[in-house]
From Swiss-Prot:
Induction: By retinoic acid. Expressed in muscle, intestine, brain and placenta and very weakly in liver. Homotetramer. Interacts with ALDOA; the interaction blocks inhibition by physiological concentrations of AMP and reduces inhibition by Ca(2+). Interacts with alpha-actinin and F-actin. The gene is Fbp2. Mg(2+) 2 binds at residues 98, 119, 121. Pathway: Carbohydrate biosynthesis; gluconeogenesis. One of its GO terms (molecular function) is fructose 1,6-bisphosphate 1-phosphatase activity. It comes from Mus musculus. This is Fructose-1,6-bisphosphatase isozyme 2. Gene3D superfamilies: 3.40.190.80, Fructose-1,6-Bisphosphatase, subunit A, domain 1. Mg(2+) 1 binds at residues 69, 98. Its EC number is 3.1.3.11. It comes from the Eukaryota.
Length: 339
C-alpha cells in the first residue's frame, strides 16, 4: 500500500466531474450550469441545516403544504434557495416542488430547456430531533415547442437526464447519476467543494436488511404482511433480516444503496395509492437505484415506467437489491393468484 499525502493535488470535485461529463457529451453547457446551480443550493441548505438551532430555524412556519405536510421553517428556506438558484442558471423552464401547489414557470428572459422536479428538504419532520434529512431532484428535457407548463413535467422516469439526492447527516453527501452509473461525493467543509469518494456504486444482489414503517402493520395488504413475516421468521432456518427505519426517505434509501436489502413504502388500506410522490421522491431514487443495479417497483410495474397524470401524484415504492425486490414481487403474484 503506497503512502498518500493528506492533501490531494488532482482531486475530482463534483464541479469538475459535471464539466467533464458535459464536455464528453458535447453538450451546450446548459446541463452543466444547471447541476452546478443545484450544487450551490445544496451547499447553502447544508449550511442552514447545521446552523438551524442557532439561527432559530427549527419549528413549523404555521402553514401546510399542498401534500398535507406541516411546513417547517427550513422547508421554506430550502425551497426558496433551490428555486432561486435554478432559475438563475438560465437553464430551466419548469420547476416542480413538493412545496408549491402549481409548477413554477421560469421567466422568459431566464428560460432554458430543462424541467426540474425536486423535494427541497425530504424528511423535514425529523429536523427538530437532528435526524438525517435530504434534498432530492430529477432533471428532464422539455419535449415540446409549446409555452412551458406543468404538462412538461408529466414525463415517465425513463426520460430522466440526471438525478440525485443530497443527504445531510454526519457529513453532507451527494449521490448523482447522469445515466452512466452512480457516483458519490462528500462535501469537504474546508474546501467548500464536493469531492468524489466512490465511483460507480453497485448495490448488493441481496441484502440482510428490510426497511418499512411497521407501525402501519394493521393496514398492510396480504403480500406485504407475508413478505415481512418471511424476513422476520425465515422458513428455511436462516438468520432473520435486520429491521432499520429512519423515517427520512433519503436516509433509508441511501442505507439500502450502501448495505443492500429492501426499502418499502407500499400501498395499504390507509394509503391505497401509496404515500410517496412520484415526480420528486420516487422517480429520482428509483433512477439512482436502477443505475446502481437494483430494482424499484410500485408492486405492479417499474416505477420509472409510470406515466404521471398530475404533478403531486402518489405511488407505492419498493426498491433495493434485485433479489430482495424480486422476492417481494413473488409474494404479490402469489397473493394475486390466490384471490
Amino acid at each position: 500500500m503506497t503512502d498518500r499525502s493528506p492533501f490531494e493535488t488532482d482531486m475530482l470535485t463534483l464541479t469538475r466531474y459535471v464539466m467533464e461529463k458535459g464536455r464528453q457529451a458535447k453538450g451546450t453547457g446548459e446541463l452543466t450550469q444547471l447541476l452546478n446551480s443545484m450544487l450551490t443550493a445544496i451547499k447553502a441548505i447544508s449550511s442552514a441545516v447545521r446552523k438551524a438551532g442557532l439561527a432559530n430555524l427549527y419549528g413549523i412556519s404555521g402553514s401546510v403544504n399542498v401534500t398535507g405536510d406541516e411546513v417547517k421553517k427550513l422547508d421554506v428556506l430550502s425551497n426558496s434557495l433551490v428555486i432561486n438558484m435554478l432559475q438563475s442558471s438560465y437553464s430551466t423552464c419548469v420547476l416542480v416542488s413538493e412545496e408549491n401547489k402549481e409548477a413554477v414557470i421560469t421567466a422568459q428572459e431566464r428560460r432554458g430547456k430543462y424541467v426540474v422536479c425536486f423535494d427541497p428538504l425530504d424528511g423535514s419532520s425529523n429536523i427538530d430531533c437532528l435526524a438525517s434529512i435530504g434534498t432530492i431532484f430529477a432533471i428532464y428535457r422539455k419535449t415540446t415547442e409549446d409555452e412551458p407548463s406543468e404538462k412538461d413535467a408529466l414525463q415517465p422516469g425513463r426520460n430522466i437526464v440526471a438525478a440525485g439526492y443530497a443527504l445531510y447527516g454526519s457529513a453532507t453527501l451527494v449521490a448523482l447519476s447522469t445515466g452512466q452509473g452512480v457516483d458519490l461525493f462528500m462535501l469537504d467543509p474546508a474546501l467548500g467543494e464536493f469531492v468524489l469518494v466512490e465511483k460507480d456504486v453497485r448495490i448488493k444482489k441481496k441484502g440482510k436488511i428490510f426497511s418499512l414503517n411497521e407501525g402501519y402493520a394493521k393496514y398492510f395488504d396480504a403480500a406485504t404482511a407475508e413478505y415481512v413475516q418471511k424476513k422476520k421468521f425465515p422458513e428455511d432456518g436462516s438468520e432473520p433480516y435486520g429491521a432499520r427505519y429512519v423515517g427520512s426517505m433519503v436516509a433509508d434509501v441511501h442505507r439500502t444503496l450502501v448495505y443492500g436489502g429492501i426499502f418499502m413504502y407500499p400501498a395499504n388500506q390507509k394509503s391505497p395509492n401509496g404515500k410517496l410522490r412520484l415526480l420528486y421522491e420516487c422517480n429520482p431514487v428509483a433512477y439512482i437505484i436502477e443505475q446502481a443495479g437494483g430494482m424499484a417497483t410500485t408492486g405492479t410495474q417499474p416505477v420509472l415506467d409510470v406515466k404521471p397524470e398530475s404533478i403531486h401524484q402518489r405511488v407505492p415504492l419498493i426498491l433495493g437489491s434485485p433479489e430482495d425486490v424480486q422476492e417481494y414481487l413473488s409474494c404479490v403474484q402469489r397473493n394475486q393468484a390466490g384471490r
